[in-house]
Swiss-Prot record:
EC code: 6.1.1.17
Protein name according to UniProt: Glutamate--tRNA ligase
Organism: Thermococcus onnurineus (strain NA1)
Domain of life: Archaea
Pfam families (UniProt xref): tRNA-synt_1c, tRNA-synt_1c_C, tRNA-synt_1c_C2
Keyword check for Transport: no
UniProt catalytic activity: tRNA(Glu) + L-glutamate + ATP = L-glutamyl-tRNA(Glu) + AMP + diphosphate
The family this protein is said to belong to: Belongs to the class-I aminoacyl-tRNA synthetase family. Glutamate--tRNA ligase type 2 subfamily.
Database matches in HAMAP family: Glu_tRNA_synth_type2 (MF_02076)
One GO cellular component term noted in the UniProt record for this chain: cytosol
Keywords of the record: Aminoacyl-tRNA synthetase, ATP-binding, Cytoplasm, Ligase, Nucleotide-binding, Protein biosynthesis
One term of GO molecular function: glutamate-tRNA ligase activity
Amino acid sequence: MNVEELIMKYALINAISHKGKANPKAVIGKVLGENPELRPKAKEIIPLVNQIVEQVNGMDIEEQEAKLKEIYPEFFEAKKEKKEEKKGLPPLPKAEKGKVVTRFAPNPDGAFHLGNARAAILSHEYARLYGGKFILRFDDTDPKVKRPEPKFYEWIIEDLKWLGFQIDEIHIASDRLEIYYKYAEELIKMGKAYVCTCPPEKFRELRDNGIACPHREEPVEVQLERWRKMLNGEYKEGEAVVRIKTDLKHPNPAVRDWPALRIIDNPSHPRTGDKYRVWPLYNFASAIDDHELGVTHIFRGQEHAENETRQRYIYDYFGWEYPVTVHHGRLSIEGVILSKSKTRKGIDEGKYFGWDDPRLGTIRALKRRGIRPEAIRELIIEVGLKRSDTTISWDNLAAINRRIVEPIANRYFFVADPIPMYIEGYDEEFVAEIPLHPDHPDRGVRKLKFEPGRPVYVSKDDMELFKPGSFVRLKDLFNVEILEVSEEGIKARFHSIEYEIARENRWRMVHWVTEGRACGVLIPQGDELIVRKGLLESDANVKVDDVVQFERFGFVRIDDVTPEKVVAIFAHK
């Protein structure tokens, strides 16, 4: 490998590792660091590195990868081997084949998002790994603060199925209130729970000082009478609460005699209406259902670790075995909102146009951006069971998704902010036949026609390349010399057909269209949604939900197609 090929190798590797843009200093460091015999020639090598890096940065990622495969295929083989070395999920404690039962318990008060997906995917993957059962349990017993909505029950099921889940059982907590009542009454009869009618502020003061509520040790008969009054509507909201007896000296005041069931006046629950007034809180309903449904393993966020402490009191009172609990940290993604309350507020204020707004981190939003379900699952499995909080960058998810969609995404030219280029010196019609996918010739070709006297359109993004006297190659068409640049457009002259001439002279390559279809690409950038308008190949055979690559622009998902225009959403480079 000569010096130029060596520089080209390092420049391509650096570019592919950094979104298609190589850093000259990094390349120089690699060339001289790993080839010390070249250091005496540094003054000659540095300009050559700058020249080759400029050439590499003018390629799209596809061209960079093709070139690197040509001169250094070992890079891709090493990457493949490294990936194969990656371990999957670690063994699950106390797990037996065929006996593992896991559950995912979302609240249907908003759309399923990437943060929720961690517990869901881990639960499902382990259930499948051990030939067990995966249960979806809707935790919908808070009709006041976290009010469930009918559409979210459906959406969560749809999203899980889209992610590839096989749901073995579905249970809805609001359908099981009589079961919770039965266990609450048993605990009262056992003297392990009581009905507290202290004002909330008074109980909080007693609890914080480790002092028993005056109702705590009253006879079971009195407790049962109060319990029946709760059920019969003789107490109003806030006047009575069922509490589980715990350790009044527990270091965490929130564990001391925690609330199990409370009254909600006029709940107007979407499933049960106003039939029930006494509603279990999460820890009570969850503890009962995990036992009733035979759950063996729970995957729970580290921030909810104290739930186990509370729930174990119920398990100990009934003599039940508590499920194995695996705690993991929170998962967030840089610059993407996952909070359901913030999302809802943004939708209500008109900031977002729905739960699938591509700026959001909901599963529906990721799907709308062209993120594949396999990519989301792989990302979660890669993060694994870390107890620490994890913040991933969009680039992490994009890198996985790119590897998945690259083989399936057909290629098209999209010219953003089009500028006309008038070409002289070529007087024949020229039809460029371009593969829909460079690695899959069986998919056929797309045809772009050049007609003498009619302009081609190039992107304003490439304006810095169009200087009088410079040369560029119109990708898959021919090479031209730039003659003049003005507000009206670009004048150019045909130079040659052969790609080899452009390669030998290191001329930059640009994409183009003739008569294109109007196309807008929505690009999420943090909390902003940028719209890039331009032209798509007029004969591009795209339909809604297709994920395609706009060459030199990025991967997009087709969101809308009409005879007049195409709308796409940008996924990533």
